[in-house]
């Protein structure tokens, strides 16, 4: 495994572990998701460079567009929950209370 592969693999695993174990605030969960998406973007971009084909270079840009949509939807949910519940803590968010 090359150092480049190790770095984006460890970045993805760190984001996944942060999402699984550090579940206090919604903003920290969104940041972990963004870190995972960024490492996937880097991995997909490196894969497209290795294949040296024009058709494979569209997939990283599509992933980046979906990542931006995910970030905007996540921030909209963060603002909505902060306004209704008064906090962004994940423990206070319960679907049965709505």
Swiss-Prot record:
The keyword Mitochondrion applies. The chain crosses the membrane at residues 1-21, 29-49, 58-78. Keywords: Electron transport, Membrane, Mitochondrion, NAD, Respiratory chain, Translocase, Transmembrane, Transmembrane helix, Transport, Ubiquinone. It is an enzyme of class 7 (translocase). It comes from the Eukaryota. This is NADH-ubiquinone oxidoreductase chain 4L. One of its GO terms (molecular function) is NADH dehydrogenase (ubiquinone) activity. Core subunit of the mitochondrial membrane respiratory chain NADH dehydrogenase (Complex I) which catalyzes electron transfer from NADH through the respiratory chain, using ubiquinone as an electron acceptor. Part of the enzyme membrane arm which is embedded in the lipid bilayer and involved in proton translocation. It is a multi-pass membrane protein. The lineage of its organism: Eukaryota, Metazoa, Chordata, Craniata, Vertebrata. The gene is MT-ND4L. InterPro entries: NADH_UbQ_OxRdtase_chain4L/K (IPR001133), NUOK/Mnh_C1-like (IPR039428). It catalyses: a ubiquinone + NADH + 5 H(+)(in) = a ubiquinol + NAD(+) + 4 H(+)(out). One of its GO terms (biological process) is ATP synthesis coupled electron transport. It comes from Salmo salar.
